Swiss-Prot record:
This is Valine--tRNA ligase. The keyword Chloroplast does not apply. Pfam families: Anticodon_1, tRNA-synt_1, Val_tRNA-synt_C. It is found in: Cytoplasm. It catalyses: tRNA(Val) + L-valine + ATP = L-valyl-tRNA(Val) + AMP + diphosphate. A motif ('KMSKS' region) lies at residues 554-558. It is an enzyme of class 6 (ligase).
Amino acid sequence: MEKTYNPQDIEQPLYEHWEKQGYFKPNGDESKESFCIMIPPPNVTGSLHMGHAFQQTIMDTMIRYQRMQGKNTLWQVGTDHAGIATQMVVERKIAAEEGKTRHDYGRDAFIDKIWQWKAESGGTITRQMRRLGNSVDWERERFTMDEGLSNAVKEVFVRLYKEDLIYRGKRLVNWDPKLRTAISDLEVENRESKGSMWHIRYPLADGAKTADGKDYLVVATTRPETILGDTGVAVNPEDPRYQSLIGKFVILPLVNRRIPIVGDEHADMEKGTGCVKITPAHDFNDYEVGKRHALPMINILTFDGDIRESAEVFDTKGEESDVYSSEIPAEFQKLERFAARKAIVAAVDALGLLEEIKPHDLTVPYGDRGGVVIEPMLTDQWYVRADVLAKPAVEAVENGDIQFVPKQYENMYFSWMRDIQDWCISRQLWWGHRIPAWYDNDGNVYVGRTEDEVRQENNLGADVALRQDEDVLDTWFSSALWTFSTLGWPENTDALRQFHPTSVMVSGFDIIFFWIARMIMMTMHFIKDENGKPQVPFHTVYMTGLIRDDEGQKMSKSKGNVIDPLDMVDGISLPELLEKRTGNMMQPQMAEKIRKRTEKQFPNGIEPHGTDALRFTLAALASTGRDINWDMKRLEGYRNFCNKLWNASRFVLMNTEEQDCGFNGGEMTLSLADRWILAEFNQTVKAYREALDNFRFDIAAGILYEFTWNQFCDWYLELTKPVMTGGSESELRGTRHTLVTVLEGLLRLAHPIIPFITETIWQRVKVICGITADTIMLQPFPEYNAAQVDEAALADTEWLKQAIVAVRNIRAEMNIAPGKPLELLLRGCSEEAVRRVNDNRSFLQTLARLESITVLPADDKGPVSVTKIIDGAELLIPMAGLINKDDELARLAKEVAKIEGEIARIEGKLSNEGFVARAPEAVIAKEREKLDSYAEAKAKLIEQQAVISAL
């Protein structure tokens, strides 16, 4: 084996070999249990980020673990067309390169342009997924816009429409005036903002007066430009100031519209003046109030967010109405919405109706992609009736057919599902699944899979002109069908029969409603088992937290704190990293700050760590459902772990290759250390499997680390040295056999988390064991064997380890050279302790560097010594001639003084109010942690001073 572990040399060739050999495919054995995971489809034109790496590591670990248990496993891979994101990327690209818009191209040519762009850049993310070691079945790769999935989408739309579960209606949506499309709540970013509250007088009609004799109401608003669309004023029915006015009217300033005063709980007596203007076409709350009181809806804005030339007036059902005039005063027509705000405030003021303006903190909705303020807009959209679909989906979680890990996410799911709103599924984009609906010139709507089908079903001749709906479906609509459309539905395929319902879905909690809930609803509606019972899409939902930076901040391009997972695998120079973080920024003014921070954090760029180290770190940080603060130190630690495993394997191979390891017969004698490591490994297998079965990847990683580093490398390899240097033939055979057996089992155990290094080493180890199989991937996963429990070996070895550690600690505390042989005395020994010393004298002497071991008689106190208590005995190391008492005390005093200086420095920092107020939470926590560890170190030094003073 190569002297040093170099992941760059082994990982890519190995992956290509695995893929070529077809090891990632299901084994096709239908007598075996199936296990299937559907990858959450990443955006086709995107690139891999830490969240992907994290979730995919967890999925691959599960898939490899189940595959090694002989199950028929499928990890289904694919990508998402990501409507709005992809269209924006391509629009930006043609604007930058050609100075054109999509309208210059026209719909078909622009869509061709997107397909072209997908062909060029769509492979990036799948290449990166290969680098992570993902054992997905690439031959089954799907894309949400490929033919099969597009057919499934049409099928679902048509069936839901025929069942009256899809309808078209005029509703209020989040409208992005820049992108000119409806967007989902998920794409709205609410920002805190300092604004104003305008108090405006609305004159009362018909001579009405308020309780205190005024002939007007004062209405408070943060959006005066929408006055043009007001159709009512709401007051709280309990408010004594206005109770008598409910049912009366006001005259709307500027347009002189007579609008009613309604009593509604939405008006808060404590807030503003207690009177709220109601604009049903431009505010979500007002829309609901309007529905309750049958107020008309008046749309005053164009899709670009400008004031219309004439308003659109609708009744509550969304039908056109002439109940109010559609006139808009000429001076406001065509004004941009924020310019209109200024003009309207000035006009109200000129009429003497502006009572006051107060500063006001408010939350403003922005589109997360377009970056402009979102308008609630009344538009014709397609909707799915969600309540009917939600009922069985709620029951499936209530009765345990679907379980959330961790369980607390069920509450989040229930709270949303039990109060579910109809789902707006249409988007005013060009890229996506076009809605399979056609209109004739009379405005009739026909829904079908194709235009031909529509004509046939409705007996429409060639003389009837049909035009297809311009809109496309929300990306989440096709994603909601992911678990079954990828397996060939609506055909009843073998894959669907074998792998549905799928086993586990790994997802971030942020898309629990947008994706998880909708998959459950759609799947249960369309997929039934042989008894007609609705099928769930998956049995378990494993929820992950977000990956944040080391200070707990969300990773984002604008913060400049994003780390590309592949930069940790391959390494990246500082100049390249700076270019990545500061090039093409939306906010170039942030570049300098980001540059400084990056130079401080990565002065030499990022070292290459290899895929296995990255995967191990991700698994180790995966504490259920919690956000993770990324830690480069942990990554270094797991890179060191891979080195340790490599070096330990080299040691084993050097001592076993071409040697008699007992695999072809011959007498074997197992030492206590051999029996101990076999028993220890057996226990490790049990705990490790339990952790993986319970989705505790963090615990599994910890168990693997602890066994490999501490038990196998630090202890067992040391404990084999006495046999290796002076054992009999049968003892040598026994120890070699144990070395190879445990290493081979350990490689299989670790394989799901760190696949590359384990396969590479296993290819060498299998030869010694006489294994002829091609790959570790398809080897059986280690199983716990109750017959291999060896309590005596475990207890005896733990005692020996205690004794060795005690001697080593005395050396360290007393500053005695590690190589200096010591005399060990044991006082007050139990019979068990005496037996253990006598049985393992040579082990103890070799590993603790002792020149002699003496068990003192019961009445012998022994010479002046440093002592340690272990089970059933007190260890004494006589100090005569070993240390100079005065020198040692002086050295310790110096150490104490140094630590006291550090403690004073940190205490000063933490008592500085300015520092505590400004520094991030994580930085303060780190300082407190340092303080605690210094205090602990000081206490230990003082203890040592006391021991030496007493000598």
